[in-house]
Regions:
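Aromatic-enriched
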Residues: 317-401
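Short alpha-helical "patches" and their helix-cap loops
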Residues: 96-101, 167-168, 309-310, 325-331
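Residue-level detector of alpha-helix boundary/anchor positions
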Residues: 132, 164, 357-360
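Transmembrane helices and adjacent periplasmic/lumenal helix-loop junctions
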Residues: 164-183, 298-308
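Primarily membrane-embedded glycan-assembly and transfer machineries that use lipid-linked glycans
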Residues: 1-161, 186-303, 310, 388-400
Length: 401
């Protein structure tokens, strides 16, 4: 089935290219209801524009005039090693193409689809509106999807090499830390030490660069549309209703952590044979689910980050076809929620033609995002190997000598 997946992916990319050639660049993106900017690959231009601002003597964390949107540069300081290489706005298109090639190349390689249903689901997510948004913007997360996949594949050859790729990803973008589930295994071994090492490294990294991290979080654009996260719906209601909508800021966090606790509890109570799938697909699920749940808890994340849910698809495609069990029902609901979330822009285009209809479609999307959050957390816990729970139990009941 691997060849079928690669062929399907290639045909999909070729069809988009042909559509752009005959129908037009902007018109093609609008088929998915993607907001198109005059300047293509807008997100990669944050990097090339910042490099040019830096070269001209500006501090891009305060004033970034060579970025098309004059956006403040809010990446970790280590990015300056790359920015000082002399890249400028002319490099935007080559960098965008390289990012897309890297993304689609690793996407072609990593999954082990079991059947045609898995390929259908992979295709539906790959060419969904949420992911088309990431391609149109050429968002840098395309590179970090690739680095996560590379870390996953290297683990089958060299754990230290995989760990090095993971650490570099964390240094440049932080959130790949949530993918450390790739260092789990069906059988007990020493690989989880790499996950512990990644957590320890990140804690030290935060301690050393704390002021930079605070600046990053405070200046990151937080959307209330084309976004997912625990704050998104509440920010939207506050923006549309104004003073009529006022709740304590703790409420979204309380709701998210209550759902998290319930998902962990029921996932633990109803563990089943979810580990009875290919190990690579299982590790990919832990990585993708970890990134979605982790970034959801950060508050606001743009929809292009749904690209990481691709990592969950091969496992989900197998689980939904299993027979019986609460975990299988949750897996099926999770797949439905994933498809609704990824295709939200299309649903909005078709049905959100009035303010009232738009709000209904928006509400459906938010319900899907929260359902996906619960479902992926539940399945993450339910799919963890039994030896891990045994080790945790032994650690908790261990008596001091």
């Amino acid at each position: 089935m691997k060849r079928v997946w690669v062929a399907t992916l290639s045909v999909g990319i070729a069809l988009i290219g042909l559509c752009m050639y005959f129908y037009g660049y902007e018109n093609t993106w609008r088929l998915w209801n993607i907001p198109v900017f005059k300047s293509p690959f807008l997100d990669i231009q944050l990097i090339t524009g910042t490099a040019e601002s830096l070269e001209k003597g500006f501090d891009p964390t305060v004033n970034n005039p060579y970025d098309p949107g004059h956006r403040i540069f809010n990446y970790p300081k280590v990015w300056y090693l790359f920015l000082n290489l002399g890249i400028g706005r002319r490099a935007a298109v080559p960098l965008a193409i390289a990012s897309l090639v890297l993304f689609f190349g690793t996407l072609a390689v990593f999954p082990k689809p079991k059947d045609k249903f898995a390929i259908l689901l992979l295709t539906a997510v790959t060419f969904s509106a949420a992911l088309m948004l990431s391609y149109e913007r050429a968002n840098v997360d395309l590179v970090f999807f690739a680095s996560t996949v590379i870390a996953l594949l290297l683990l089958e050859v060299s754990a230290p090499a995989s760990f090095l790729v993971m650490i570099l990803s964390i240094v440049f973008k932080i959130f790949p830390l949530f993918a450390i589930g790739i260092y789990l295994d069906k059988r007990k071994n020493k690989l989880p030490m790499y996950a512990i090492g990644a957590i320890a490294f990140t804690a030290l990294y935060f301690a050393v660069t704390w002021q930079n991290m605070k600046h990053i979080f405070s200046t990151t654009q937080k959307g209330n549309d084309l976004s997912y996260g625990l704050m998104v719906a509440f920010d939207y209601m506050e923006a549309t209703m104004g003073a009529a909508f006022s709740i304590p800021s703790i409420v979204p966090y309380a709701l998210a952590f209550v759902l998290l606790g319930l998902a962990v509890y029921f996932g633990f109570r109803q563990r089943s044979q979810l580990t009875d799938i290919d190990l690579r697909n299982l590790r990919a699920f832990w990585a993708g689910a970890g990134i979605y749940v982790g970034t959801f808890l950060l508050g606001n994340s743009w929809d292009y980050r749904f690209m990481f849910t691709l990592l969950t698809v091969p496992a989900l495609a197998e689980w939904v076809r299993h027979k019986g069990g609460g975990a299988i029902i949750i897996a099926r609901i999770t797949v439905i929620a994933l498809l609704i979330s990824c295709w939200y822009l299309i649903v909005q285009k078709w049905f959100g033609t009035t303010n009232a209809a738009y709000n209904v479609v928006y509400a459906i999307d938010e319900i899907a995002n929260w359902t996906l959050y619960f479902g992926l957390t539940y399945l993450y816990i339910a799919s963890l190997p039994q030896w891990l729970f045994d080790e945790l139990h032994n650690f908790l009941i261990r008596k001091p000598r």
